Amino acid sequence: LKVKVKNEIVAMGVDGLQPGRRTGIEAEPELWHDVIRDPNTVVIDTRNAYEIAIGSFPGAVDPKTATFRDFPTYVKEHLEPLKGKKKIAMFCTGGIRCEKASSYLIDQGFEEVYQLSGGILGYFEKTAKQGLANKWVGDCFVFDDRVAVTKDLKPSGHEMCSVCRHPLTAKDLADPRTVMGTSCLHCYGPRSD
């Protein structure tokens, strides 16, 4: 067994960021529904593109980030002009990226920043327990053998390409370019030696 010590669980690449000090407003499902329904709110999915492709909240902005390290650039290029004009609401799988992202936005001078309490998985659990409407569309990528889960937290049937690590839908699995252990439609093609 080999243990590797890392400075950050989810790397954003921003020195001095302290999400334990201050973060956005934790929004439980009822507040979350009110916030994302507000036309003065920009809803941002802080996950990576391959996760967003599986499911998201309707109307959420896909920042088109390949990794979480791309998020500060997205903020600078797209959110800075909205500072002081719009509320920002963010969500991620379990809440870790939102903690960091909301802390970063507050450090950058954004005032009204919300984050989905417990992330998407917490939202699924809480809406089911409380009998609330679940506004999510699609499935949710998870970082374990299930690959993705449905709103009731059951495995969705997605598979993971063992070559490029891209999640695959049933349609992707039926594609002739997908040969498990060799390639999928996302990584199929000529390779360099």
How would you describe each model-predicted region?
Residues 44-45:
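Structural scaffold elements adjacent to functional motifs in cytosolic proteins
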Residues 1-25, 48-88, 96-193:
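Rhodanese-like catalytic fold shared by cysteine-dependent sulfurtransferases
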Residues 91:
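Phosphate-binding active sites in nucleotide-utilizing proteins
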Residues 39:
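Glycine-rich active-site/cofactor-binding loop and its immediate structural neighborhood
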Residues 23-28, 35-36:
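A conserved helix-loop-strand patch within extracytoplasmic ligand-binding domains
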